[in-house]
UniProtKB/Swiss-Prot annotation:
Annotated stretches, region: N-hydroxycadaverine acyltransferase: 1-190
One Pfam family it belongs to: FhuF
The protein's name: Bisucaberin biosynthesis protein C
Native source organism of the sequence: Aliivibrio salmonicida (strain LFI1238)
Region named Bisucaberin synthase: 200-819
Catalysed reaction, written as an equation: 2 N-(3-carboxypropanoyl)-N-hydroxycadaverine + 2 ATP = bisucaberin + 2 AMP + 2 diphosphate + 2 H(+); 2 N-(3-carboxypropanoyl)-N-hydroxycadaverine + ATP = bisucaberin B + AMP + diphosphate + H(+); bisucaberin B + ATP = bisucaberin + AMP + diphosphate + H(+)
One annotated GO molecular function: acid-amino acid ligase activity
Length: 819
């Protein structure tokens, strides 16, 4: 690898440029630093000729060109030599310091590139291709960059063809001051694939891609990741009454108090000191930077895995499951360090970012679960390629599956043919059908379906080998559409055509207590369930009044593997490996041409509200600051849109969703909330009335629970899992105190109940102002069984509880309760 001077605090040029007299040999070329004294006269002649017009320097004077080529802190030039003669010049630059950086979220390790090749008297076969390939190799294999960025003129077809040959994938057209450009990217993986080097990427211990996949594992980022996760462990394990911190002083909530936790074990006594504020719902808001650790009175570095081992006797986790849990903890730390390194936008900047920019910038994951980024099954390169925080665009793999072995279902207003035509287009559909025909197969005997590239590579190609050999499953390749992984990791948003469907795929990795497969049996019911719920929402004028909508899962497909169907009658991950579904996009027009989101509005998942940047500033406070509404009115409007429709679902229909942050999309205008869109309906909705008459194919929705547990769908899922985290952020960073927050919640409940007196009996039966409610402990559930936390057929079986928790709304019972 090239010797370069790389310090994080150095300028782009100091960090990445080769040393002064260094020669870098790649293929038939030598690279060295641009020398103004000896090289400018040569390159100046090139830039004055018409063939170099896309550089925009034809009309400049010699002095102006000389100034443009000078190295700066943010760009440097290299010349390429062949047999000692200068053949080309390339400029490498920092996109964040260039105009192009205003048009996309620049990532750590991005490198922009410009190129000009000397005019030649005698054309040389593939010269331009060989030059651009060598430059790409320099950037992605020899220098420590992770992504090549290009922005050629939209009319420069020659360069577009060359870029395609090095794996560049264009994402968008952008208007620049001097041109209209195509913005494109190539990662190390994409470049190697374009050169046919994929097989060596994962196997060569000397390959730079391996170090790039661990470049975030520095002492600084690892310390911060452990600091963050231990703070979360203290918060959540104390909330679930697994550990009991001791308060050392009597500071008020305006200032954090000092706390202590002591663990005694066979290996010694560990003590953690920290500062934290105490909030409602037994929530400790820990200051991560305040945490210190000693073991037997000796200072220790912060280590989240050691924290777990120190208190393992309190966790009630089996010896068999503990190693897997520790792996999940380590993977979560790995992911956090990656996010810390690549977190390049403040919350204030994200408040004005696009939907997918925000989605890729999220750093926490589920706010309650400690081991929430396990992703067991992904290696380090998979993490870079497929994780939501990498923000990578990718192509989904498509296959054909024999219809007689496949379950396919679609909503009544759609058909398979219409769906596939809308998603693929006629040209791509013809290409796939032609592939089948050329293999002697009848296209009408097959369904086409998208799958996750990792799932194809790691699972389907091997476990379904017999089906592939027998042409029950036929690989077809990829389409041109680019997708981005969402926070839920197995769901993809179409970047190329945002109006097309989300695609949710089976992904056989273990993440947060589940193997993330999709059951083909459940796929067969999914569109009908979505239609049933959507009809209920759409025909009730209250939901329309509150601007509460759902995104339907309009079609679903699942392949049945005959071996595993015979091997086990019970639920099993092997039976959930090959399924996908299509979900409506919020940008898709309805049958009348109307869309949920117009150009003045923007989207973000509700999980984004809890995002905190590296300066400790939350996104929800940044949105409030940028909104014309007061902080209190912003929050009231949010409760009107979010809480009240969920109350109506519960009291009017016994209907509950899983309303956590990733399942809801918040629509904003002027950074004020105006709509709520619920998604992920199929697997995470229930009717809490076992006696309620439902259509035959809807019986799976009925859940028979005791009344207190029904109420937990609001008190736990909304209050404890969402509001518990929002309230402290608002108290610390806005004009909304914690008491203000819960009063606004109580007012919202009261307003709803007064507007709907017909449910008075239910308000008394399900009392939202009750003194306390069941403390359902999600981390205890994961510790009990981190392979499958919840049995969807029996949701209560694996639940774990501690002492009941005080309800913040009880303070308002006398003034707000409907009597």
């Amino acid at each position: 690898m090239t010797d370069f001077t790389a310090k994080a605090q150095c300028s782009f040029t100091d960090r990445y440029a080769p040393k002064k007299d260094q020669l870098i040999n790649i293929s038939e070329f030598e690279f060295r630093n641009y020398n103004e004294d000896t090289d400018f006269s040569v390159i100046n002649q090139w830039l004055s000729q018409s063939y170099s017009s896309y550089w925009g320097m034809n009309e400049l004077t010699e002095d102006q060109r000389n100034l443009e080529l000078k190295n700066t802190a943010h760009k440097f030039g290299l010349v390429g030599l062949k047999r000692g003669k200068i053949l080309f010049y390339t400029e490498l630059y920092h996109p964040a310091k260039d105009e192009i950086g205003e048009h996309y979220p620049v990532q750590e390790g991005d490198c922009g590139m410009h190129l000009i090749i000397a005019p030649v008297d005698i054309p040389e076969h593939r010269l331009s291709q060989n030059v651009i390939t060598a430059i790409s190799s320099l950037i992605l294999e020899h220098l420590p960059f992770t992504r090549l960025v290009v922005e050629p003129d939209i009319q420069n077809e020659k360069v577009h063809r060359l870029n395609h040959l090095i794996g560049i994938e264009y994402s968008q057209i952008v208007p620049l001051n001097s041109k209209t450009a195509k913005l494109g990217f190539a990662t190390k993986s994409q470049f190697l694939q374009s050169q046919g080097k994929v097989s060596s990427m994962k196997n060569s211990s000397k390959n730079p891609s391996l170090s790039l996949a661990t470049s975030h594992l520095t002492t600084e980022y690892w310390h911060k990741a452990n600091q963050h996760l231990i703070a979360k462990m203290i918060t959540e394990l104390s909330h679930e009454q697994i550990i009991t911190p001791i308060k050392l002083d009597d500071a008020s909530n305006a200032q954090a108090a000092s706390w202590c936790i002591t663990f005694n074990s066979d290996t010694g006594t560990s003590e953690y000191l920290f500062r934290a504020r105490q909030y409602q719902l037994d929530h400790l808001f820990v200051e991560p930077q305040s945490i210190t650790c000693t073991k037997d009175d000796k200072n220790q570095p912060l280590d989240a895995v050691s924290f777990i081992l120190s208190c393992r006797h309190l966790l009630e986790i089996s010896d068999a499951l503990l190693p897997t849990y520790l792996e999940e903890i380590t993977s979560t730390l790995y992911s956090k360090a990656y996010k810390l390194m690549h977190q390049n936008k403040t919350s204030a900047q994200l408040a004005n970012a696009s939907y997918q920019e925000i989605e890729a910038a999220m750093t926490e994951g589920h706010p309650v679960f400690i081991a929430n980024n396990g992703r067991i099954g992904f290696d380090m390169l998979d993490h870079v390629e497929f994780s939501p925080e990498s923000g990578q665009s990718l192509n989904l793999q498509w296959i054909a599956v024999l219809r007689e072995k496949t379950s396919f279902a679609v909503i009544e207003s759609l058909s398979y043919d219409r769906l596939i035509f809308d998603e693929l287009g006629q040209s791509q559909l013809n290409e796939f059908n032609q592939q089948l025909s050329m293999q002697g197969l009848e296209p009408s005997h097959y369904y086409l379906m998208p799958i996750h590239p990792w799932q194809w590579r790691e699972k389907i190609s091997r476990i379904f080998a017999a089906d592939i050999a027998n042409q029950y499953v036929v690989p077809l390749g990829t389409t041109e559409d680019k997708y981005q992984a969402q926070q839920s990791i197995r769901t993809f948003f179409n970047l190329s055509s945002p109006e097309k469907c989300y695609v949710k795929t089976a992904l056989s990795i273990l993440n947060m207590g589940f193997m993330r497969g999709l059951s083909p049996y459940y796929m067969s019911r999914t569109p009908a369930i979505n239609t049933f719920i959507a009809n209920l929402i759409e025909t009730d004028p209250y939901f329309a009044k509150k601007q509460f909508f759902v995104l339907k899962e309009v079609a679903a497909i699942g392949y049945h593997h005959s071996y595993y169907e015979q091997a086990t009658r019970t639920d099993n991950p092997y039976k959930k490996m090959l399924s996908s579904l299509w979900r409506e996009s919020p940008y898709a027009p309805d049958q009348h041409g109307n869309v949920l989101v117009n150009k003045q509005q923007k989207l973000l998942t509700m999980a984004s509200l809890l995002h905190v940047d590296d300066q400790g500033k939350s996104l929800i406070s940044a949105l409030m600051a940028d909104s014309p509404l007061s902080d209190h009115n912003w929050l009231k409007q949010y409760m009107d849109l979010y809480l009240q429709p969920l109350l109506h679902s519960f009291f009017a229909y016994d209907l509950v969703f899983m309303p956590h942050g990733e399942n809801l999309i918040l629509v904003l205008e002027d950074n004020s909330p105006i709509k709520i869109i619920m998604k992920d309906i199929g697997e995470e909705v229930a009717i809490l009335n076992g006696e309620k008459t439902l259509p035959n194919d809807m019986n799976c929705l009925a859940v028979d629970l005791e009344d207190p547990m029904k109420l937990n769908y609001i008190l736990l899922d909304i209050f404890d899992c969402i509001f518990r985290f929002i309230a402290p952020l608002l108290e610390q960073q806005t004009q909304v105190s914690e008491s203000d927050f819960w009063e606004i919640v109580a007012d919202s409940v009261k307003d709803y109940q007064q507007e709907h007196p017909q449910f008075d009996a239910k308000y008394q039966r399900y009392d939202l102002y009750c003194s306390s409610f069941a403390r359902t402990c999600l981390n205890r559930i994961q510790l009990n069984n981190n392979q499958q936390m919840i049995d969807l057929e029996d949701r209560e079986k694996n639940l774990r509880f501690a002492e009941d928790i005080a309800n913040p709304l009880a303070l308002f019972a006398k003034t707000h309760r409907i009597i």
